[in-house]
Amino acid sequence: MQMVPSLPPASECAGEEKRVGTRTVFVGNHPVSETEAYIAQRFCDNRIVSSKYTLWNFLPKNLFEQFRRIANFYFLIIFLVQVTVDTPTSPVTSGLPLFFVITVTAIKQGYEDCLRHRADNEVNKSTVYIIENAKRVRKESEKIKVGDVVEVQADETFPCDLILLSSCTTDGTCYVTTASLDGESNCKTHYAVRDTIALCTAESIDTLRAAIECEQPQPDLYKFVGRINIYSNSLEAVARSLGPENLLLKGATLKNTEKIYGVAVYTGMETKMALNYQGKSQKRSAVEKSINAFLIVYLFILLTKAAVCTTLKYVWQSTPYNDEPWYNQKTQKERETLKVLKMFTDFLSFMVLFNFIIPVSMYVTVEMQKFLGSFFISWDKDFYDEEINEGALVNTSDLNEELGQVDYVFTDKTGTLTENSMEFIECCIDGHKYKGVTQEVDGLSQTDGTLTYFDKVDKNREELFLRALCLCHTVEIKTNDAVDGATESAELTYISSSPDEIALVKGAKRYGFTFLGNRNGYMRVENQRKEIEEYELLHTLNFDAVRRRMSVIVKTQEGDILLFCKGADSAVFPRVQNHEIELTKVHVERNAMDGYRTLCVAFKEIAPDDYERINRQLIEAKMALQDREEKMEKVFDDIETNMNLIGATAVEDKLQDQAAETIEALHAAGLKVWVLTGDKMETAKSTCYACRLFQTNTELLELTTKTIEESERKEDRLHELLIEYRKKLLHEFPKSTRSFKKAWTEHQEYGLIIDGSTLSLILNSSQDSSSNNYKSIFLQICMKCTAVLCCRMAPLQKAQIVRMVKNLKGSPITLSIGDGANDVSMILESHVGIGIKGKEGRQAARNSDYSVPKFKHLKKLLLAHGHLYYVRIAHLVQYFFYKNLCFILPQFLYQFFCGFSQQPLYDAAYLTMYNICFTSLPILAYSLLEQHINIDTLTSDPRLYMKISGNAMLQLGPFLYWTFLAAFEGTVFFFGTYFLFQTASLEENGKVYGNWTFGTIVFTVLVFTVTLKLALDTRFWTWINHFVIWGSLAFYVFFSFFWGGIIWPFLKQQRMYFVFAQMLSSVSTWLAIILLIFISLFPEILLIVLKNVRRRSARRNLSCRRASDSLSARPSVRPLLLRTFSDESNVL
């Protein structure tokens, strides 16, 4: 009996990814021998827990997570200082805003977690049927244990990860959809091992005695390694290998199959679906980094203000009679307090007084803006694709503004730039090109050059080639007829994860060889004579991105064993006899230059003795539980040698609609586009010309195997080419200007082509003096090229390219877009990852930050949505710091007139409500709805994108502009009111207002000015903007009347009683408020007027030039200010 390996403690059961070793699962939880003791297994139960909190740990855990944010922790410290130290303001002023922010966030997270709890309970309490003692037993899903045999009916979801034992079909197959896991809606076929196919009843399945050895849980949906040991009465184990085709994943749905039986191998939080709950590594946008930098600057300003006021307080008190009057002598405790300690206490008090310069509510507003703003992408009807009946999807809202800051775009070719809708065009057999089909069934239409004729070229070779196309694939067949087997009259539907394979099978069908499907391990083919041929499928050597080929080993009805192989020319040519290559190579290169996807086809006969050895090696490799993939790859390499080349195929993959226009727009926007593909150079190069990545006047620089192999020493030749190309580019671009994007149109354009083997040579070059800087020189060349094509790239090489560019000086923002599993690595590596909802599965879309149906949607996503998102959030950030500096500066200036006594200028209610109620909604509405430029203009004039690149609106210049504007306005608020107070004319009875009235006037001017400033900046008015802007001002007035019109019993001092009403009873106060608001906004209004005059003048000159010039010219690009202040017409 096989013993259960040592298990981790129960606390480590869920979500552990870094486990080593294997686990043993006993089918039905029965021992394999009745005579030996059964050791109970310890695995996780089948409960799914996607929630973060429980009822008892929600409060401490949520608070801990929220106070890890620096701003929240800072305000907590301020609040504690107010509670413990005698500060000038009430703890409520900082405690209430902090409480509001914490409460809103906690409610949001608690509600989301409540929904997760509800969803978990629906899954955990669902009904399942377990086979126990040959009977169907009804249980709740959460009570499934590892080893239980589960019965699943049609259209039901698998409750855990199961190994398929049997199904209602005679061949032990079942159809599954995994739409809830990876978004793929097409049916996939899964298989049971042949020894358990017949066990299709509860009674028979209960007699099975077997043990499954498999890897520990890991999150990859497409990988599984295991074996099943089946014990007969003689206790002789029969071992069968298990792979992903035998594993039914939790969350997938059974389709077109009445029922199946499977044994649970992974349950609960160890299922692949649960392990995939964990999010991808957190990506931070450039705006977030700018916010942190601004916080540091304003924290420095805060500390400086507190230090200055503390110092000046003691300087002022050092003057005789300034410290204390004779009637207010110090107490004994105050006299005994150390002066240093008193100074430190005063310093803390000033920090509390000025702490509102740090915007605590900004984080909440930014989060709401990102979350709500992401819906505009999902709601955009232009992203809807009728073919797949889907639109765009936002997987993360944290990177919306990053879409407006992209410098480099890395794109896949197949399925991204092209349709991935393959059509068989032609083939080449033994160096002869065949195109089209004749009415004769005994020959193909052969064309060489311009001459078209029919020739009986070795009939056996033709049929061998077509049989290879019909047999060497993983295509599955679905017939609309439910009769026994496919017939000529039945309508065949081919299903495969690879559109190439479907195109080849359909191409063979055009020439008279029809693939009829796989039944009980036999592949059935109808030949040109309408005869049914059967081939026993012995082994499938699956395709992978490293090998770039796939093979099958079949046995004919005559008993011959054949290996058919198809793959890229670079993967097949080295494995066939050299004298067979040249004729076929000519056609392959010609087809590649025409933009077709090419595959080479080869075969070899395997002697029975050789097959016995091969079969033994394959079984041993498939049975391995450790390093199975590496062992199988080694066996595949040994098998796929000394083959005979038959021919090659050419498949057309049409360019996607508007792909060329999209790339042109990206180039015009200043973005550098790189194509990273696994295709051969000629095919990719042709596609790049077709999609206008390369222009006719683009000079191409090649770093490929072909150019490197001109020399005996590859590294020497590589070094020569790198130096040559760098000199040429440095001569063309003598200075590395900051605006190198504009230089593209002023100099000769260059494009670079590099293949995977040359890239490996660059990255892994020997560390001698001549080659240790290959990478640096290569990057210098790349930066000077307008476009780069990387062909023959492995998935990891794509990620290496992205990582190299990310680490360039200046940290350019990278975006990767692709549609297949081989693009996932570069999508995860880049700053922004975009997945195409393509025909090669949804792995790319599932691992991306955003997913769109087509490549053409990238244009609007970046040029319109990205532009607007960046402008909105950049304005939001600058505005928050601006309005808080306006808020605090009068408080700071007031200390010079109150003996630095820490006397607040504003009432505590105003301190509390300023950021929460009076000024928060207008900027939130602006940051969601603002369109400073029309969307059609943004997409039609890509050059506008360059105006905001490089995080332009959050650089030092705009930051200083907003800071000085706030300083100017804050000074006007305070000193304007102060000088108006010099006369007694503000009140009719000649009395002068008190300090609370003074502060209320300043605060009123402040609220109206910062709100009207936002109104001046708004270019796109909606009813929501009107409501929140004028509504906020009305609410402030109403609140002030309400707050000052009632004697509140919970207040010790009624400071504000009747202050606001008395203030507005004076006509002079009204005039003063209006005058100060106008003076504060006058620079803004003046700038608007000047910009409008300049705009009208520019339009008039442009009209004159157009009238005098017969050639149509594009409209000049209107410069976008580094702040969002408008030179467009204003509704206001």
Swiss-Prot record:
Residues 86, 312-346, 901-908, 977-995, 1048-1069 are extracellular. It is a multi-pass membrane protein. It catalyses: ATP + H2O + phospholipidSide 1 = ADP + phosphate + phospholipidSide 2; a 1,2-diacyl-sn-glycero-3-phospho-L-serine(out) + ATP + H2O = a 1,2-diacyl-sn-glycero-3-phospho-L-serine(in) + ADP + phosphate + H(+); a 1,2-diacyl-sn-glycero-3-phosphoethanolamine(out) + ATP + H2O = a 1,2-diacyl-sn-glycero-3-phosphoethanolamine(in) + ADP + phosphate + H(+). The flippase activity is inactivated by caspase-mediated cleavage in apoptotic cells, allowing for PS exposure on the cell surface and engulfment of apoptotic cells by macrophages. The ATPase activity is up-regulated by aminophospholipids PS and PE and down-regulated by Increasing intracellular Ca2+ levels. One of its GO terms (cellular component) is lysosomal membrane. Proteolytically cleaved by CASP3, CASP6 and CASP7. Phosphorylated at Ser-1116 likely by PRKCA; this creates a functional di-leucine motif that is sufficient for endocytosis. The active site is at residue 412. It is found in: Cell membrane; Endoplasmic reticulum membrane; Early endosome membrane; Recycling endosome membrane. It comes from the Eukaryota. Catalytic component of a P4-ATPase flippase complex which catalyzes the hydrolysis of ATP coupled to the transport of aminophospholipids, phosphatidylserines (PS) and phosphatidylethanolamines (PE), from the outer to the inner leaflet of the plasma membrane. Major PS-flippase in immune cell subsets. In erythrocyte plasma membrane, it is required to maintain PS in the inner leaflet preventing its exposure on the surface. Component of a P4-ATPase flippase complex which consists of a catalytic alpha subunit ATP11C and an accessory beta subunit TMEM30A. This is Phospholipid-transporting ATPase IG.
